[in-house]
UniProtKB/Swiss-Prot annotation:
This is 5-hydroxytryptamine receptor 2A. A motif (DRY motif) lies at residues 172-174. A motif (NPxxY motif) lies at residues 376-380. Belongs to the G-protein coupled receptor 1 family. The PDZ domain-binding motif is involved in the interaction with PATJ, CASK, APBA1, DLG1 and DLG4.
């Protein structure tokens, strides 16, 4: 009897709740259709209906039900991530085009920057859209489970390639400052591409264990329905190998490069001052020197002064390049350090830290790291005139630089002037040779005249002697 009473009581309570729900729904629908309800009533009806929908889905914990709830909300974070994706893809495509088409930018450092732009562009194409999709689905993995390991692999690959490219650029600049002769001799386009291939090979080797183990065991890449690295050992080792060790090398070599440039600039300035003092004491009055000696002195003096000016110019160019690269390095460190530090904290203080807070921080910090891929083209635009002019032309669909009228005049007139000057020099040489021949002929004629006069005087003296003897 007690059981029957309890069942009747539960059935009656359920029936009453359903009747009350139907009455409330009918009341709200009638008020809404008749137009008698005001704005606040309509808003309350909407909120109440959403609450009832949430209550009806409380028992449904499947990913599809939760995904529908999150898709109904306005997600401004997804909109911001879409803007970051567009900027990343468009900006890095411009960098690739600039290095490929502009001859001024075709050197070893810019080849590294082009490869870095390729990594950032692929990150924007293959990784960021999937990450935005997980945001829309409440950080649940909406794709097939086998693609989770592949997505994490691409994410780690392109992020590792970015830091490895910056580390290689820093090492290459340091070697160029310390041993410029060896670097200029072996720093061809082929050598630069071989270094880039080595960077990509290292990046692939570091990130390859993710698909190898993740495809075999889903627990290493899934955690509570979210696609992320769940293996603590790989998180620790990967963070140090792919970020902190290259970061340390990059920072040390960058500061050593700056120190070497400052030292070379000081030595160059002191060397130029010493040469100027020696030159002021060694000059003689122009009247006491012949034109030939003056010409020889100018020939021997010009290369030294030109070399000094060229050395200062090269040091200045290196300092400007280091300034731009320093900004790129700093932005990369500032934007990626929070993610990797939080990633290590999630492993070290796993029991004491709040997992929900750590997870929310990682979701924010990873997009701050992605933002560095979109910032690099903006840095090149602000601090490099060649990149800036190339980007502006490419946006206007002008892929070749239009020569200015002055440049066209110089291109048309300089060869003619050079030809005329060469012809003038050849004419002067011919005239000098002809003058030398005429002087030689004159000298030979004078010598013949002198010999003829001597012979004539000799004949006259012989004739006089004969006459005297006859007498």
């Amino acid at each position: 009897m007690d059981i029957l009473c309890e069942e009747n009581t539960s059935l009656s309570s359920t029936t009453n709740s359903l009747m009350q729900l139907n009455d409330d729904t009918r009341l709200y629908s009638n008020d809404f259709n008749s137009g008698e309800a005001n704005t606040s009533d309509a808003f309350n009806w909407t909120v109440d209906s959403e609450n009832r929908t949430n209550l009806s889905c409380e028992g449904c914990l499947s990913p599809s039900c939760l995904s529908l709830l999150h898709l109904q909300e306005k997600n401004w974070s997804a909109l911001l991530t879409a803007v970051v994706i567009i900027l990343t893809i468009a900006g890095n495509i411009l960098v690739i085009m600039a290095v490929s088409l502009e001859k001024k930018l075709q050197n070893a450092t810019n080849y590294f920057l082009m490869s870095l732009a390729i990594a950032d562009m692929l990150l924007g194409f293959l990784v960021m859209p999937v990450s935005m999709l997980t945001i829309l689905y409440g950080y649940r993995w909406p794709l097939p489970s086998k693609l989770c390991a592949v997505w994490i692999y691409l994410d780690v690959l392109f992020s590792t390639a970015s830091i490895m490219h910056l580390c290689a650029i820093s090492l290459d600049r340091y070697v160029a400052i310390q041993n410029p002769i060896h670097h200029s001799r072996f720093n061809s386009r082929t050598k630069a591409f071989l270094k880039i291939i080595a960077v990509w090979t290292i990046s692939v080797g570091i990130s390859m264990p993710i698909p190898v183990f993740g495809l075999q065991d889903d627990s290493k890449v899934f955690k509570e329905g979210s696609c992320l690295l769940a293996d603590d050992n790989f998180v620790l080792i990967g963070s140090f190998v792919s970020f902190f060790i290259p970061l340390t090398i990059m920072v040390i070599t960058y500061f050593l490069t700056i120190k070497s440039l400052q030292k070379e600039a000081t030595l160059c300035v002191s060397d130029l001052g010493t040469r100027a003092k020696l030159a002021s004491f060694s000059f003689l009055p122009q009247s006491s020197l012949s034109s030939e000696k003056l010409f020889q002195r100018s020939i021997h003096r010009e290369p030294g002064s030109y070399t000094g000016r060229r050395t200062m110019q090269s040091i200045s160019n290196e300092q400007k390049a280091c300034k731009v690269l320093g900004i790129v390095f700093s932005l990369f460190v500032v934007m990626w350090c929070p993610f990797f530090i939080t990633n290590i904290m999630a492993v070290i203080c796993k029991e004491s830290c709040n997992e929900d807070v750590i997870g929310a921080l990682l979701n924010v910090f990873v997009w701050i790291g992605y933002l560095s891929s979109a910032v690099n083209p903006l840095v090149y635009t602000l601090f490099n005139k060649t990149y800036r002019s190339a980007f502006s032309r490419y946006i206007q669909c002008q892929y070749k630089e239009n020569k200015k009228p002055l440049q066209l005049i110089l291109v048309n007139t300089i060869p003619a002037l050079a030809y005329k000057s060469s012809q003038l020099q050849m004419g002067q040489k011919k005239n000098s040779k002809q003058d030398a021949k005429t002087t030689d002929n004159d000298c030979s004629m004078v010598a013949l005249g002198k010999q003829h006069s001597e012979d004539a005087s000799k004949d006259n003296s012989d004739g006089v002697n004969e006459k005297v003897s006859c007498v």
